[in-house]
Amino acid sequence: GMHGMISQVEGLAKALDLEFIHEKIELNSFWKLFPPRLTPIQDFVFKNKINNKFDIVISCGRKSIIPSIYLKKKFKSKIINIHIQEPKVSLDNFDFVVAPEHDGLKGSNVLTSKGAVHYLTNSELDENENYLKSRISTEKKIVTLILGGPNRYYDYNNQVIDLSLIHISEPTRRS
């Protein structure tokens, strides 16, 4: 969902050590219904005007593809545009595309990641390494599982989570 995409954009901006602002650029209601490959790259498709000038645009997900391409076409080499996730439009629309390795996306401007990009840094992890030490036993191995929330493809209700945990724990029980 929206938070996951913002998290990925922030993560990449932090990794690049960029100062950033969030600019929410929405397509108007009519153009939200169309896939990016069928949406015109024109300012009339936007609900709001784009007033800021940017050096780097980092977009993530389907709804941000058109604004990113629009800004790149408008400002050409004055900006760098980076899209996170498989855009399902020509990769030539972007300076860089960051996609998880499992998507199998190939191109001269494609950078692959192991899983999703996130905003946690090594220094933040190091600073907080003792956070859970008083709450967990050090005598046994700890496995951490981070589950995402519901989206239009998956419904993470309690039953699905319970079944997932049972499925994951079965190999452990056998050993």
Regions flagged by a language model, labelled:
Residues 157-164:
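Charged helix-capping and loop-helix junction motifs
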